[in-house]
A protein has these predicted regions:
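A short acidic, Gly/Pro-enriched loop at the edge of an enzyme's catalytic core
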Residues: 118-127
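A short glycine-rich, Lys/Arg-flanked "PGG" loop and its adjoining helix->strand segment in the class I
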Residues: 140-152
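Class I SAM-dependent methyltransferase SAM/SAH-binding core
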Residues: 65-67, 71-116
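Conserved class I S-adenosyl-L-methionine
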Residues: 2-58, 73-77, 95-98, 157-180, 184, 211, ...
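Short alpha-helix
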Residues: 185-207
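Conserved Class I S-adenosyl-L-methionine
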Residues: 205-246
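A short SAM/SAH-binding and catalytic strip from SAM-dependent methyltransferases
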Residues: 126-139
């Protein structure tokens, strides 16, 4: 399949609803090609937002918990900040396998029922979670578990598909063997996340909301679907959030 067709399928798939696959099974399928994707506007924007947030943080000597670490796509950036340790969690054993190919000494755990097994209470300085929140069914339980392992004064960094995009018919998907795989996900409005954060005394430091704009226009131009770009221009597509535990 040509790059053009892949991009075309990816952007169109963002606005269709189909039969969905559970995240663990979907990412087991995606693992073999996940690090090679060049046609994903969400991954592109997420990298920009995640890196912008991390650029403002001092991670030297700190313990970082990465919830939904996947293949470790953010680990080069995190490791460049010289943390003491990264502990990775993911629901997909295949994604963790790919991570260990890149980082053989990595500490990782297969994630079940949101439990951060292997991390003690108040033991970490930061929890990061990139493109994961929308896959979590029981978000209050998950955030409570993050709060359990996080030290007072520790920080939380979340990036994810914007709920407004999902409510508007957007999908989380990828192409495998010329077929689009749609991943089961849940819509968690930002006000709901903020209410949960307030309940745990997480103080908002920064909120970035990225919209369909000129920075991703080329994805639409390359597949000749500028009408989709024009229709969605200005619509929220991804957010990045930084909190500090009080």
């Amino acid at each position: 399949m040509s790059i053009l067709r892949k991009i075309k399928g990816k952007v169109r798939s963002l606005f269709r609803r189909k039969k969905t696959t559970e995240p663990a099974a979907a990412y087991d399928i995606w693992a073999s090609s996940y690090d090679r994707q060049k046609d994903n506007p969400i991954a592109y924007l997420n990298s920009l937002v995640f890196n912008d947030i991390l650029d403002a943080l001092d991670l030297e000597g700190k313990t970082i918990v990465d919830v939904g670490c996947g293949t470790g796509s953010n680990w080069d950036k995190i490791l460049s900040k010289r943390p003491y340790k990264i502990i990775g969690y993911d629901v997909s054993s295949e994604m963790l396998g790919r991570l260990h190919q890149k980082y053989p000494q990595a500490t990782t755990f297969l994630l079940h029922d949101n439990a951060l097994n292997g991390s003690w209470d108040l033991s970490c300085d930061m929890v990061v979670s990139s493109l994961v929140v929308g896959y979590i069914k029981d978000l209050p339980a998950a955030l409570a578990e993050w709060n359990r392992v996080l030290k007072r004064g520790g920080e939380i960094v979340i990036t994810d598909f914007h709920p407004v995009a999902l409510q508007g018919g957007g999908n989380r998907s990828f192409t495998h063997e010329e077929k689009v795989v749609y991943i089961k996900n849940y819509v968690h409005p930002l006000h709901k996340i903020k209410a949960l954060a307030n309940k745990m005394n997480w103080q908002e430091i920064d909120l970035i909301e990225r919209k369909v704009d000129e920075s991703i226009k080329f994805f639409f131009e390359e597949q000749h679907v500028l009408h989709v770009y024009e229709k969605e221009f200005g619509s929220p597509i991804l957010y990045g959030w930084r909190f500090r535990k009080g």
